[in-house]
Amino acid sequence: MQSVSDIRQYFIDELAAENFVTDKTGVKTIELVGASFHADEPTIFGKLNDDYIKRELAWYKSKSLNVNDIPGKTPEIWKMVADKDGYINSNYGWCIWSDEIDSSDTVMRNKGRHNRGQYWRVYNELSNNRDSRRAVMIYTRPTMHEDYNRNGMSDFMCTNAVQYLIRDDVLNVIVQMRSNDVVFGYRNDFAWQDYVASLLENALRCDGRKIIWNVGSLHVYERHFSLVE
Protein backbone atom coordinates (compact mmCIF):
# COMPACT_ATOMS: atom_id res chain seq x y z
CA MET A 1 0.00 0.00 0.00
CA GLN A 2 1.17 3.51 -0.76
CA SER A 3 2.17 5.87 2.05
CA VAL A 4 1.98 9.64 2.47
CA SER A 5 5.54 9.80 1.18
CA ASP A 6 4.43 8.15 -2.08
CA ILE A 7 1.53 10.58 -2.45
CA ARG A 8 3.84 13.51 -1.79
CA GLN A 9 6.22 12.35 -4.51
CA TYR A 10 3.35 11.92 -6.97
CA PHE A 11 2.39 15.58 -6.66
CA ILE A 12 6.02 16.71 -6.87
CA ASP A 13 6.46 14.73 -10.09
CA GLU A 14 3.17 15.96 -11.58
CA LEU A 15 4.08 19.58 -10.87
CA ALA A 16 7.50 19.13 -12.49
CA ALA A 17 5.83 17.59 -15.55
CA GLU A 18 3.18 20.35 -15.59
CA ASN A 19 0.37 17.80 -15.66
CA PHE A 20 -2.52 20.02 -14.66
CA VAL A 21 -6.30 19.79 -14.59
CA THR A 22 -8.12 23.09 -15.11
CA ASP A 23 -11.34 23.49 -13.15
CA LYS A 24 -14.51 25.33 -14.19
CA THR A 25 -13.15 28.64 -12.91
CA GLY A 26 -9.95 28.35 -14.95
CA VAL A 27 -7.78 27.51 -11.95
CA LYS A 28 -5.11 24.86 -12.41
CA THR A 29 -4.96 21.88 -10.07
CA ILE A 30 -2.81 18.79 -9.75
CA GLU A 31 -5.12 15.84 -9.22
CA LEU A 32 -4.86 12.19 -8.26
CA VAL A 33 -8.04 10.29 -9.10
CA GLY A 34 -8.86 7.26 -6.95
CA ALA A 35 -6.18 7.87 -4.32
CA SER A 36 -5.68 5.15 -1.71
CA PHE A 37 -2.89 5.20 0.85
CA HIS A 38 -1.88 4.56 4.43
CA ALA A 39 -2.30 7.88 6.24
CA ASP A 40 0.92 7.48 8.22
CA GLU A 41 1.69 11.21 8.48
CA PRO A 42 -0.59 14.04 9.66
CA THR A 43 0.27 16.35 6.75
CA ILE A 44 1.27 15.92 3.11
CA PHE A 45 2.45 19.48 2.41
CA GLY A 46 2.69 22.44 4.74
CA LYS A 47 2.73 22.62 8.53
CA LEU A 48 0.00 21.77 11.00
CA ASN A 49 -1.98 24.63 12.48
CA ASP A 50 -2.52 23.26 15.96
CA ASP A 51 -4.53 26.28 17.09
CA TYR A 52 -7.04 25.92 14.27
CA ILE A 53 -7.24 22.15 14.70
CA LYS A 54 -8.18 22.66 18.37
CA ARG A 55 -10.80 25.28 17.48
CA GLU A 56 -12.34 23.15 14.75
CA LEU A 57 -12.45 20.14 17.07
CA ALA A 58 -14.24 22.21 19.72
CA TRP A 59 -16.79 23.26 17.09
CA TYR A 60 -17.26 19.69 15.93
CA LYS A 61 -17.85 18.62 19.53
CA SER A 62 -20.51 21.31 19.86
CA LYS A 63 -22.41 19.78 16.90
CA SER A 64 -23.39 23.28 15.79
CA LEU A 65 -24.26 23.62 12.12
CA ASN A 66 -23.44 27.34 12.17
CA VAL A 67 -19.93 28.53 11.29
CA ASN A 68 -20.30 31.58 13.53
CA ASP A 69 -19.99 29.19 16.47
CA ILE A 70 -16.42 28.23 15.56
CA PRO A 71 -14.28 29.53 18.48
CA GLY A 72 -12.22 32.57 17.58
CA LYS A 73 -12.22 34.05 14.10
CA THR A 74 -14.30 32.11 11.58
CA PRO A 75 -12.10 31.01 8.64
CA GLU A 76 -12.98 32.63 5.33
CA ILE A 77 -13.49 29.27 3.62
CA TRP A 78 -16.30 28.41 6.04
CA LYS A 79 -17.92 31.81 5.47
CA MET A 80 -17.73 31.25 1.71
CA VAL A 81 -19.56 27.90 1.77
CA ALA A 82 -22.15 28.82 4.43
CA ASP A 83 -25.61 30.16 3.66
CA LYS A 84 -26.55 33.77 4.41
CA ASP A 85 -27.24 32.89 8.04
CA GLY A 86 -24.01 30.95 8.54
CA TYR A 87 -25.40 27.43 8.26
CA ILE A 88 -23.55 24.54 6.62
CA ASN A 89 -23.84 20.74 6.33
CA SER A 90 -20.32 19.67 7.23
CA ASN A 91 -19.96 19.77 10.98
CA TYR A 92 -18.48 16.31 11.30
CA GLY A 93 -19.28 16.12 15.01
CA TRP A 94 -22.93 16.61 14.13
CA CYS A 95 -22.57 13.91 11.49
CA ILE A 96 -21.45 11.21 13.91
CA TRP A 97 -22.86 12.25 17.29
CA SER A 98 -26.18 13.85 16.41
CA ASP A 99 -29.26 11.89 17.27
CA GLU A 100 -31.41 14.94 16.62
CA ILE A 101 -33.18 16.43 13.65
CA ASP A 102 -31.47 19.57 12.31
CA SER A 103 -33.53 22.37 13.85
CA SER A 104 -32.04 25.03 11.53
CA ASP A 105 -34.41 24.28 8.67
CA THR A 106 -38.10 23.47 9.13
CA VAL A 107 -38.41 22.04 5.63
CA MET A 108 -35.56 19.61 6.23
CA ARG A 109 -36.86 18.92 9.73
CA ASN A 110 -40.12 17.77 8.25
CA LYS A 111 -38.16 15.43 5.99
CA GLY A 112 -36.53 13.89 9.07
CA ARG A 113 -32.98 15.10 8.54
CA HIS A 114 -30.75 13.56 11.21
CA ASN A 115 -27.80 11.20 11.40
CA ARG A 116 -28.98 8.75 14.03
CA GLY A 117 -25.94 8.53 16.32
CA GLN A 118 -23.37 7.08 13.91
CA TYR A 119 -20.57 6.95 16.48
CA TRP A 120 -22.57 4.92 18.97
CA ARG A 121 -23.82 2.57 16.28
CA VAL A 122 -20.21 1.75 15.41
CA TYR A 123 -19.23 1.41 19.05
CA ASN A 124 -22.14 -0.91 19.80
CA GLU A 125 -21.53 -2.98 16.68
CA LEU A 126 -17.87 -3.59 17.50
CA SER A 127 -18.60 -4.11 21.19
CA ASN A 128 -20.96 -6.92 20.26
CA ASN A 129 -18.87 -8.35 17.42
CA ARG A 130 -15.19 -7.40 17.09
CA ASP A 131 -15.04 -9.18 13.72
CA SER A 132 -17.92 -7.18 12.24
CA ARG A 133 -17.80 -5.61 8.78
CA ARG A 134 -20.87 -3.48 9.50
CA ALA A 135 -19.21 -0.81 11.65
CA VAL A 136 -19.64 2.18 9.35
CA MET A 137 -20.21 5.84 10.22
CA ILE A 138 -22.19 7.35 7.35
CA TYR A 139 -21.53 11.07 6.98
CA THR A 140 -23.35 12.12 3.83
CA ARG A 141 -26.92 11.35 2.75
CA PRO A 142 -28.95 10.95 -0.46
CA THR A 143 -30.47 14.42 -0.10
CA MET A 144 -27.02 16.04 -0.29
CA HIS A 145 -27.71 16.63 -3.99
CA GLU A 146 -30.34 19.17 -2.91
CA ASP A 147 -29.00 20.13 0.51
CA TYR A 148 -25.60 21.33 -0.68
CA ASN A 149 -26.91 24.62 -2.12
CA ARG A 150 -30.05 25.28 -0.14
CA ASN A 151 -30.54 28.85 1.04
CA GLY A 152 -27.43 29.94 -0.87
CA MET A 153 -24.83 27.66 0.72
CA SER A 154 -22.25 25.66 -1.24
CA ASP A 155 -21.39 22.70 0.98
CA PHE A 156 -21.52 19.25 -0.60
CA MET A 157 -20.06 17.10 2.16
CA CYS A 158 -16.58 15.79 1.31
CA THR A 159 -16.59 12.70 3.55
CA ASN A 160 -18.89 9.90 2.45
CA ALA A 161 -18.33 7.34 5.20
CA VAL A 162 -15.73 5.79 7.49
CA GLN A 163 -15.53 2.05 8.14
CA TYR A 164 -13.92 0.50 11.22
CA LEU A 165 -12.50 -3.02 11.27
CA ILE A 166 -10.75 -4.66 14.22
CA ARG A 167 -8.17 -7.17 13.04
CA ASP A 168 -5.47 -8.64 15.30
CA ASP A 169 -6.69 -6.17 17.92
CA VAL A 170 -5.72 -3.20 15.72
CA LEU A 171 -8.44 -0.71 14.80
CA ASN A 172 -8.34 -0.23 11.02
CA VAL A 173 -9.98 3.03 9.92
CA ILE A 174 -10.99 3.23 6.25
CA VAL A 175 -11.84 6.82 5.33
CA GLN A 176 -13.89 7.27 2.13
CA MET A 177 -14.00 10.78 0.66
CA ARG A 178 -15.37 12.19 -2.59
CA SER A 179 -12.92 15.12 -2.60
CA ASN A 180 -9.93 16.24 -0.54
CA ASP A 181 -7.60 19.23 -0.81
CA VAL A 182 -4.06 18.00 -0.17
CA VAL A 183 -2.85 21.06 1.73
CA PHE A 184 -5.50 22.26 4.20
CA GLY A 185 -8.17 19.62 3.72
CA TYR A 186 -6.09 16.52 4.39
CA ARG A 187 -4.35 17.70 7.52
CA ASN A 188 -7.51 19.04 9.18
CA ASP A 189 -9.54 15.99 8.17
CA PHE A 190 -6.76 13.67 9.33
CA ALA A 191 -6.70 15.37 12.73
CA TRP A 192 -10.45 14.79 13.06
CA GLN A 193 -10.37 11.16 11.93
CA ASP A 194 -7.40 10.38 14.16
CA TYR A 195 -9.24 11.92 17.12
CA VAL A 196 -12.35 9.82 16.54
CA ALA A 197 -10.21 6.72 16.01
CA SER A 198 -8.41 7.36 19.31
CA LEU A 199 -11.75 7.45 21.13
CA LEU A 200 -12.80 4.13 19.65
CA GLU A 201 -9.37 2.58 20.14
CA ASN A 202 -9.51 3.34 23.85
CA ALA A 203 -13.18 2.49 24.31
CA LEU A 204 -12.83 -0.85 22.53
CA ARG A 205 -9.44 -1.61 24.10
CA CYS A 206 -7.64 -2.06 20.82
CA ASP A 207 -3.88 -2.30 20.50
CA GLY A 208 -3.19 0.55 18.09
CA ARG A 209 -4.90 2.08 15.08
CA LYS A 210 -4.21 2.44 11.36
CA ILE A 211 -5.88 4.92 9.02
CA ILE A 212 -6.34 4.16 5.32
CA TRP A 213 -7.29 7.16 3.18
CA ASN A 214 -9.43 6.72 0.03
CA VAL A 215 -10.35 9.77 -2.06
CA GLY A 216 -12.14 10.16 -5.39
CA SER A 217 -10.29 13.42 -6.16
CA LEU A 218 -7.17 14.26 -4.16
CA HIS A 219 -5.88 17.59 -5.40
CA VAL A 220 -3.61 20.61 -4.95
CA TYR A 221 -4.86 24.05 -5.98
CA GLU A 222 -2.68 26.36 -8.06
CA ARG A 223 -2.33 28.81 -5.17
CA HIS A 224 -0.55 26.08 -3.19
CA PHE A 225 1.88 24.92 -5.90
CA SER A 226 4.72 26.65 -4.03
CA LEU A 227 4.19 24.24 -1.12
CA VAL A 228 4.71 21.16 -3.29
CA GLU A 229 8.25 20.20 -2.40
Label for each model-derived stretch:
Residues 1-229:
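Terminal, non-catalytic protein-protein interaction segments that mediate quaternary/complex assembly
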